[in-house]
C-alpha cells in the first residue's frame, strides 16, 4: 500500500488508516477473535496507522486494541485522543495528563506516537468546546510536557468547530497533525465551495494545514456510512450518527450520496464507497484516510479501493458537477 509523510512528523503512514471508533464499531463491540484477525489482516495489507480515543466505548476501544497489540507485537503508528469534559475545564492540564495516562494503561503501552485533542474548537467555547485561547494557552503546554516526558511523540487537533477558530489554531504552527472532515458530501476543507452549498464551510482548511506543515488525517471519509448509499447500519456500528459538517441528519446525507451514483454508471468507480475513498486520497494534502470497520470484508474492500489510487481528473470534474446540484438546498 502507498504511504505518505504525515506532515512534519516525518512518519511514513499508509494512505488508508484503521479507525477504531464506534461508527464502525468492530474495536468497540466486536468479538475478540474478529478484532485480532482484523488488526492482523490490516497489517498484512500494509495499513500502519491505527486511531483510537479514550471516549470510544468509554475506553473499550483502547482496551481491545491494547489486548490485540500485546499479542501481535506489531510495528505500527498509534494515535489516541483526549476530550476534556466541561467539568474539568478549571484544570485542563490535569485532565489532559490524566487522560493520556489512563489511555496508556488501557493500551498497555508506555507511549503513543500521536496524542490529539478531541474537543471541538469554537470562538466562544461552551460546555466541552474550547476556544483557541484555551487550546493554545492551556492544552498546548500540557501536550508539550507529555512530549518531554516521552509519553507522546507528536500531538494534534481534531479540526471540528468554527472555521476561523480552526484556521487560527492551524496557522500558529504548534500542532503536528489535524484530523479533518473531508468527503464527497462536504469538500469545503479541500476546495472553495459555491455560496449556498448546504454544508459547513471549512474554508479550504487543508491549505492552512499544508502551510503549517501539519500531517492530515482525513475523517468522516464515508460520512459515517452515508456514502455507502444505504440507511442500514451494521449491528456493531453506532445505531445513530450525527453528521459532521454535512447534512442536517444522516438520512439527508444518504439521499445526497445516492445522487452521486452517476459516477458508477459512467464507469469512474465500482461503488460509492470506492469513489469516496479514492476521492479523499486524490487530495495531495491528505496523509492518511481514516475508515472505521465493522467487518473484515469491509476492511478488505477499503484496502482494495485505496490500492486503485486517486480518482482521475475526469472523475473529479464530474463529481464537482454533481455536487453543484446541492447548491441552494437547505442544510
Model-derived regions, located:
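N-terminal binding-site loop/beta-alpha segment at the start of enzyme catalytic domains
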Residues: 1-76
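Active-site mouth loops of central-metabolism enzymes
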Residues: 21-33, 82-94, 128
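Short, acidic/polar
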Residues: 29-42, 91-106, 161-169, 276
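Conserved, mostly hydrophobic/aromatic
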Residues: 6, 18, 50, 65, ...
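Alpha-helix-loop-beta-strand connector modules within alpha/beta enzyme cores
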Residues: 63-80, 136-149
Amino acid at each position: 500500500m502507498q504511504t505518505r509523510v504525515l506532515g512534519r512528523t516525518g512518519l511514513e503512514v499508509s494512505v488508508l488508516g484503521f479507525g477504531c471508533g464506534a461508527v464502525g464499531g468492530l474495536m468497540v463491540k466486536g468479538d475478540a477473535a474478529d478484532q485480532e484477525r482484523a488488526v492482523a489482516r490490516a497489517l498484512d495489507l500494509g495499513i500502519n496507522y491505527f486511531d483510537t480515543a479514550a471516549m470510544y466505548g468509554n475506553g473499550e476501544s483502547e482496551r481491545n486494541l491494547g489486548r490485540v497489540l500485546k499479542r501481535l507485537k506489531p510495528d505500527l503508528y498509534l494515535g489516541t485522543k483526549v476530550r476534556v469534559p466541561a467539568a474539568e475545564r478549571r484544570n485542563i492540564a490535569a485532565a489532559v495528563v490524566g487522560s493520556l495516562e489512563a489511555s496508556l494503561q488501557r493500551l498497555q503501552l508506555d507511549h503513543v506516537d500521536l496524542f490529539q485533542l478531541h474537543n471541538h474548537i469554537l470562538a466562544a467555547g461552551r460546555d466541552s468546546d474550547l476556544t483557541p485561547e484555551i487550546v493554545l494557552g492551556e492544552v498546548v503546554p500540557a501536550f508539550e510536557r507529555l512530549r518531554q516526558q516521552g509519553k507522546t511523540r507528536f500531538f494534534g487537533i481534531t479540526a471540528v468547530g468554527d472555521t476561523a477558530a480552526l484556521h487560527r489554531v492551524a496557522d500558529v504552527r504548534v500542532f503536528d497533525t489535524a484530523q479533518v472532515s473531508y468527503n464527497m458530501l462536504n469538500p469545503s476543507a479541500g476546495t472553495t465551495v459555491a455560496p449556498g452549498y448546504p454544508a459547513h464551510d471549512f474554508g479550504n482548511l487543508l491549505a492552512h494545514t499544508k502551510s503549517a506543515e501539519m500531517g492530515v488525517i482525513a475523517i468522516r471519509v464515508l460520512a459515517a456510512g452515508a456514502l455507502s448509499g444505504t440507511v442500514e447500519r451494521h449491528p456493531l456500528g453506532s445505531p445513530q450518527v450525527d453528521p459532521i459538517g454535512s447534512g442536517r441528519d444522516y438520512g439527508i446525507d444518504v439521499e445526497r450520496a445516492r445522487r452521486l451514483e452517476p459516477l458508477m454508471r459512467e464507469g469512474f468507480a465500482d461503488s460509492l464507497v470506492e469513489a469516496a475513498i479514492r476521492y479523499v486520497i486524490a487530495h495531495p494534502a491528505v496523509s492518511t484516510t481514516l475508515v472505521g470497520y465493522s467487518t473484515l470484508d469491509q476492511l478488505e474492500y477499503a484496502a482494495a479501493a485505496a490500492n486503485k489510487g486517486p480518482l482521475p481528473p475526469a472523475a473529479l470534474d464530474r463529481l464537482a458537477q454533481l455536487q453543484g446540484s446541492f447548491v441552494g438546498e437547505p442544510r
